[in-house]
Amino acid sequence: MEDRHRYLFFIFAIIHYVQAQQGFISLDCGLPSNEPPYIEPVTGLVFSSDADHIPSGISGRIQKNLEAVHIKPYLFLRYFPDGLRNCYTLDVLQNRRYMIKAVFVYGNYDGYNDYPSFDLYLGPNKWVRVDLEGKVNGSVEEIIHIPSSNSLQICLVKTGNSLPFISALELRLLRNDTYVVQDVSLKHLFRRYYRQSDRLIRYPDDVYDRVWSPFFLPEWTQITTSLDVNNSNNYEPPKAALTSAATPGDNGTRLTIIWTLDNPDEQIHLYVHFAELEPVGENTDEALRTLFTRTFYFVVNGKISYDESITPLDLAVSTVETVVNKCDGGNCSLQLVRSEASPGVRVPLVNAMEAFTAIKFPHSETNPDDVISIKVIQATYELSRVDWQGDPCLPQQFLWTGLNCSYMNMSTSPRIISLDLSSHKLTGKIVPDIQNLTQLQKLDLSNNKLTGGVPEFLANMKSLLFINLSNNNLVGSIPQALLDRKNLKLEFEGNPKLCATGPCNSSSGNKETTVIAPVAAAIAIFIAVLVLIIVFIKKRPSSIRALHPSRANLSLENKKRRITYSEILLMTNNFERVIGEGGFGVVYHGYLNDSEQVAVKVLSPSSSQGYKEFKAEVELLLRVHHINLVSLVGYCDEQAHLALIYEYMANGDLKSHLSGKHGDCVLKWENRLSIAVETALGLEYLHSGCKPLMVHRDVKSMNILLDEHFQAKLADFGLSRSFSVGEESHVSTGVVGTPGYLDPEYYRTYRLTEKSDVYSFGIVLLEIITNQPVLEQANENRHIAERVRTMLTRSDISTIVDPNLIGEYDSGSVRKALKLAMSCVDPSPVARPDMSHVVQELKQCIKSENLRLRTGLNQVIDSKSS
């Protein structure tokens, strides 16, 4: 019972504090999502986890020995190893003024003792570069900003090798009649109260949780009061900051405050708070009152910047606002100067002051209706792309994958004009929020698992010029209004139950059509088979027919690429040059038409299973076409001679390059990433772009070939299997594949699926990263995945990466690639990603590496120009 009462008391306390902090958002970044909100004991502020406001990042904690000097909200942090841009989304009040604070306490959370730097963005605009070098106690960035919508995005952007992170996010709603500026935001420069002290003032003394630091120079004189000071003006500076003031020392007549700027051209906004702490009594006669009234002028950078003289109010605050357009050489000064004509004897004073630099954010956010629509689409289809964060269209280098936008000028909001969600395994109906993208010109939803009908609203989207709904499970009739649209290209093949014209056939009223169609089809198939059998019997010797009874299944269409054995002899110059050898047979170099280089794979006569694999590869390669799959030029099927003719891949296979068989040439990290993503694209096509889908079943580095430009193409389809509509996407089989690359799940189920290819690709990716053998013979055939998993727990990535790369890589992209590879080789097939996800993740790795290369190039150019 006592515990229950204590719990209820805690809940009521939280509610009380939250109600007192209306308009506050206080996020403890990295605090585990299962941790409840808590009251920070020093300030009484209620902090909660940030997990509901960002889809990415990993929780970290500063080192134990550093925790004592920080308050609780700064002990945890969230760091971002994935993606270039990671964004918080916060619900705010549109067109209301907020103070936004971002806190960064590194605390050597990663053990590297390497202080990071990165960029911080507000929506599509850069706010500030965060550089923590030398800032042992952390850093705080603060800005006063008016959101243009009811959703605010705060993004951390990777700029180099270090990982962005954040400790806390704090938003405070301000009065709209304070800090009023035109078309700019105010970046915090300093906020001081003038007293000899070491105490920071913040909430609850300051109702807006502004943090005031003490400042005092030895040559000044301090005055204080124990009387109450009225702080009731628009700004409400805390009373604790108003009960002291600085005045000139040694009977001086002017008080000088100096500060410096990194950029001398920055515009400065000053807010100076005054209160008279030595009031003249009410009963004092007029002459003495005049003598002891404090009157002075405001002089900035040597010029009077405030037309009227300033007379502080007795024990009450008044605030003077002024703008400084430029500080020569970055040296700024504010002087409070007693007027020589003033009859008063008192010198100037200042109680507190705030200084800001003006930032003009050039880019307008993407049209808010488009943003709402694309986020509803993202949520409906559960699209978890790491780059689908922040503003969809801006900055352009962070444009969401699959989108294109129109850009007029920086002051006009971009519009989404193209949406490509092909091959994303979308399920359910076509989401109606697509129609709210009113400027959409291109819509691609092909190669998914969408159901339901084609919606009428597509016909009403006047901007649409192209719609691709191919290869889904859509049903019913296409709206006539959509078919009647001129200047609209509509693709919808691969939807068996979707009708192009008129009402679809049903079980009633269309029985005659239902019966006639299959009968006619059966007759046509029978005649075709009969013709094939007759031709086959006439042309083939009986011995060959007995050896290969299913050869008649090769279609007549395939014969268009048929090459005779004599042509094979001619193109290979009687099999002069061997370029490879495998279980299928020998591969020879050759020339087609005396000009085009080709690779000729000849079936060994001793191969008992050769013809089945030969047939599979011919039929597969003749119907798949992808830039990252090796193209079949032709084939030979002549009596006892079987051969496949491929495009020639001048740079051999990936394994030979990794093993050093090509001399001293080491594949750079950017080249390895390109090879990985190109291989992944080939596999993605087999799994998602082919109907029916295909499983390669023998993905390995030796089957990844490189052309003269080092473009990767997947080869050796002899073991591949395709799956018809309605057939389960797995195959029960005898022993296939290559030891080390073969899915361990196969030894339990004797089945191979798309996730088996994913596993094999993960092994290849580990080879690419580490350049280690898949099976280590000197260590009882210990597997590469097991070795890397152990190394990840004991050391950093530099000991895992191929030493031949000599550190020339972006550590973030390597870390991301390693994480991806380990997810691909997860023992549970369900936990492995699909190839579409693999492609997207590898593209992010390439972006990170390209950013490193561009940064390095710019540094070289800068050094040469200087």
Swiss-Prot record:
Instruction: Give GO terms: molecular function aspect only.
Output: ATP binding; protein serine kinase activity; protein serine/threonine kinase activity
Q: Name a GO CC annotation attached to this entry.
A: membrane
Q: Which residues form the signal peptide?
A: 1-20
Q: Where in the cell is it found?
A: Membrane
What's one Pfam family here?
Pkinase
Which stretches are transmembrane?
A: 516-536
From what superkingdom does this record's organism come?
A: Eukaryota
Q: Where are the LRR repeats?
A: 415-438, 439-461, 463-485
What is the membrane topology here? Single-pass type I membrane protein
Residue span(s) of domain Protein kinase: 573-846
**Sites bearing Phosphoserine, chain numbering:** S732
Q: Which residues lie on this side of the membrane: Extracellular?
A: 21-515
User: Record's PROSITE patterns?
Assistant: PROTEIN_KINASE_ATP, PROTEIN_KINASE_DOM, PROTEIN_KINASE_ST
- Residues of the active site are D698 (proton acceptor)
Question: What Gene3D superfamilies does this protein map onto?
Answer: Phosphorylase Kinase, domain 1 (3.30.200.20), Ribonuclease Inhibitor (3.80.10.10), Transferase(Phosphotransferase) domain 1 (1.10.510.10)
User: According to the UniProt topology, which residue ranges lie Cytoplasmic?
Assistant: 537-866
Q: What is its EC number?
A: 2.7.11.1
Modified positions (Phosphotyrosine) in chain numbering: Y646, Y746
Q: Which reaction does it catalyse?
A: L-seryl-[protein] + ATP = O-phospho-L-seryl-[protein] + ADP + H(+); L-threonyl-[protein] + ATP = O-phospho-L-threonyl-[protein] + ADP + H(+)
Q: Which residues are noted as glycosylation sites?
A: N137, N176, N230, N251, N331, N404, N409, N436, N468, N505
Query: Which EC class is this protein assigned?
Result: transferase
Question: Could you tell me the keywords of this UniProt record?
Answer: ATP-binding, Glycoprotein, Kinase, Leucine-rich repeat, Membrane, Nucleotide-binding, Phosphoprotein, Receptor, Repeat, Serine/threonine-protein kinase, Signal, Transferase, Transmembrane, Transmembrane helix
The Phosphothreonine modification is found at T564, T733, T738
Stated family? Belongs to the protein kinase superfamily. Ser/Thr protein kinase family.
Tell me what this protein is called. Answer: Probable LRR receptor-like serine/threonine-protein kinase At5g16900
